[in-house]
């Protein structure tokens, strides 16, 4: 390798390293909150639904649905993220909310980190009679927070007639 090629390569490498360091510093300034990586290893659920931790209060999906529904008739299911309003800013937000009826996906809404919104979604659901042969079905909601991972909440619904 000649001297000129060596100097050119060394200079470009040094510049790239400097840019990378500057980009990392800018990212650190813009995204000051560190994410707890252990929250991304599994599906997070409330350890004790009667006594939620501050983290659980902001992240466990809360499902509001009738206790009893009639098969084949539409009803409303509201899914909110936590009992406490979750921030929706550029550094901390809910990416999506989804609802499953039993093991079947029913709907999913993608969220955007634009301002301080109240992440809450309303679904209109119809449960076919054959979907709940035992007369009960579980509604399962999931949400994903960019800093605190994937969270789940569920509620059982009685299905009649």
Feature map (PLM): residue ranges:
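C-terminal segment of N-terminal export signals and the immediately downstream linker at the start
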Residues: 20-63
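Exposed aromatic-hydrophobic patches
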Residues: 119-128, 154
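Short amphipathic, basic-aromatic surface patches that mediate peripheral association
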Residues: 80-89
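Short acidic/polar inter-strand loop motif in beta-rich domains
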Residues: 144-154
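Structural beta-strand segments of beta-rich domains
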Residues: 73-77
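N-terminal export signals
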Residues: 5-26
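Solvent-exposed serine/threonine-rich low-complexity stretches and specific carbohydrate-binding patches
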Residues: 105-114
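Short coil-to-beta strand junction motifs in C2/discoidin
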Residues: 89-95
């Amino acid at each position: 390798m000649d001297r000129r090629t060596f100097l050119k390569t060394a200079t470009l490498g040094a510049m790239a390293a400097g840019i990378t360091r500057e980009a990392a510093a800018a990212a650190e300034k813009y995204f000051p909150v560190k994410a707890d990586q252990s929250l991304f290893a599994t599906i997070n659920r409330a350890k004790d639904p009667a006594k939620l931790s501050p983290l659980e209060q902001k992240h466990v999906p809360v499902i509001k649905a009738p206790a009893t529904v009639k098969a084949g008739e539409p009803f409303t299911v509201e899914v909110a993220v936590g009992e406490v309003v979750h921030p929706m800013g550029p550094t901390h937000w809910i990416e999506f909310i989804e609802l499953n009826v039993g093991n079947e996906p029913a709907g999913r809404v993608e969220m955007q980190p634009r301002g301080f919104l109240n992440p809450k979604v309303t679904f209109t659901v119809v449960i076919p009679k054959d979907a709940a042969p035992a007369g009960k079905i579980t509604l399962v909601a999931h949400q994903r927070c960019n800093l605190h991972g994937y969270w789940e909440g569920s509620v059982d619904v009685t299905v009649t007639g």
